[in-house]
Amino acid sequence: MSVKEWPVSERPREKLQTQGAEYLSDAELLAILLGSGSGGQDVVSFARRLLSDFGGVGALLTATPEQLLACNGIGPARVNQLRVVLELSRRYLKWQLERSDGFTEPTMVKDYLTSQLRHQGREVFAILLLDSQHRLLRYEELFQGTINAAPVYPREVIKLVMQYNAAAVILAHNHPSGVAEPSQADQRVTERVKKALTLIDVALLDHFVVGAGDPISFAERGLL
């Protein structure tokens, strides 16, 4: 039975209009975005299957185009729809960080870094440059390496800090393996960058490692 044959009160679009987006399930919201089902499934069932196959909204939105195209019912147009949603969410999180005291809201920082780094297929070292009020000046991906290592040079970090006159820094990198636990190499790199920043009186506020779960904070672990 198609969604159009459902009781009006159960249809996602009508629920959105009468109750608000916050009352819709992930599958119902995704169904509105997709517009139609696939392979005989109504759009809500199709959306539920996608979420189940990928393991949730975050994994679906950060999946690669190749992973998405491997699913029955997803073609280039739907891949582009999902990519647009992810990019809009990234820009919204960046907008929030630019207008708020972002470091006092670590969840927001973690969400932003997850959206930027979790989908990367190789290791990436990134930096958040902050002003004296800890508001975001710029996000920059400095180095990309193999899946096992990304070379980090403190002088490149310093160069970028000086270019944007940053007062504080947050470091971040991803572990494509999915295991976010900081390695000894991660800790050594963090210490090297911290010492270099100290010479120019710039604070290193945190270093996040992004994996499959919640990003790991060096500050929360007492590793800074």
Swiss-Prot record:
Coiled coil: none annotated. Residues 102-224 form the MPN domain. It comes from the Bacteria. Disulfide bonds: none annotated. A motif (JAMM motif) lies at residues 173-186. Gene3D superfamilies: 5' to 3' exonuclease, C-terminal subdomain, Cytidine Deaminase, domain 2. Signal peptide: none annotated. SUPFAM superfamilies: JAB1/MPN domain, RuvA domain 2-like. Zn(2+) binds at H173, H175, D186. GO terms for molecular function: metal ion binding; metallopeptidase activity. Keywords: Hydrolase, Metal-binding, Metalloprotease, Protease, Zinc. It holds the Pfam family RadC. GO terms for biological process: proteolysis. The keyword NADP does not apply. Belongs to the UPF0758 family. PANTHER family: DNA REPAIR PROTEIN RADC (PTHR30471), UPF0758 PROTEIN YEES-RELATED (PTHR30471:SF3). NCBIfam families: PRK00024.1, radc. This is UPF0758 protein IL0240. It comes from Idiomarina loihiensis (strain ATCC BAA-735 / DSM 15497 / L2-TR).
